[in-house]
Amino acid sequence: MKKIGFIIINYNDYKTTKKLVDNIKDYKVINEIVVVDNKSTDKSVLELKKINNITLIANEENYGFAKAINIGCKYLIDKYKDCYIFVSNSDIRIEEENDLKELVKTFKVKDIALVGPVIKEPDGVVRGWKLTSVNEDILMNIPLINRIYRNKLLNYKDSYYKTLLSYVDMVKGCFFLIDSKALEKINYLDENTFLYYEENILAKKLKVKKYKTVINNKVTIYHDHAKTISKNVNNINRYKITKESFMYYEKNYNDANSLQIFILKILNNINLIVKKIRKK
């Protein structure tokens, strides 16, 4: 049986991280809990050092989400070689150990590299998404009409999730389970984004290598959506960070040409102006 690691990314939120550790610390399915602190500016490292039976990796700077995940994954792979790795935000709640066991069982199906659960958030349920073309992304960024296209282009129909496993292009990055061998073969997550669009890039990299991504509809995990991010980044700055990652993704993974990039930049600026006006 492969060893199983559980990575939690922490930034200025040790209380929430500790709550998740307390949630899972007695789960025998997990061989090691790794907390990666992304150079928190509060007393996170001091407080996290007090927690028994975890491995704490305190980064020397805030590397962003993707690199922090890679640091945790590389630690586990160096130690266990071949393993399954849970990657989790700190603001996650797991109902019971059997939920994690069920997700691990999913790997019995051939060519699956990544497994996601159903994610229950305060404002609804999230499962998987479709990867979209550049032109579809342009449509989804046009003010006023974007909502018309967003649901149709991104989401699978509810009926798609009636079976135990649903194959999807990508899952929500707040919580997923990945096979270390697949992660090594795609050369880990791309560290050129600081925050956001990790899911899209990971999905593209897995797809190129012919790996499968699934939602296990039997398992529901609870997410206090964006609690940590909201606490540390205001809405305008969050939008700017999102769009920086978005443009990097479009250029490097979604085959956007120079005209499409130009159009997307204009739309980004228009949407930023709209956000600032609404904030006043």
Which residue stretches match the model-derived regions?
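Short, well-formed alpha-helical segments that are part of the catalytic scaffolds
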Residues: 13-26
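A conserved acidic beta->alpha catalytic loop
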Residues: 37-46, 61
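Short beta-strand-to-loop acidic/aromatic patch adjacent to the donor-nucleotide binding site
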Residues: 81-93
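Conserved donor NDP-sugar-binding/catalytic core segment of glycosyltransferases
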Residues: 93-130
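Short, flexible, basic/aromatic active-site loop/helix in glycosyltransferases
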Residues: 134-168
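A short, conserved alpha-helix in the catalytic core of glycosyltransferases
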Residues: 161, 169-220
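Active-site-adjacent helix/loop segment of glycosyltransferases
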Residues: 204, 208-280
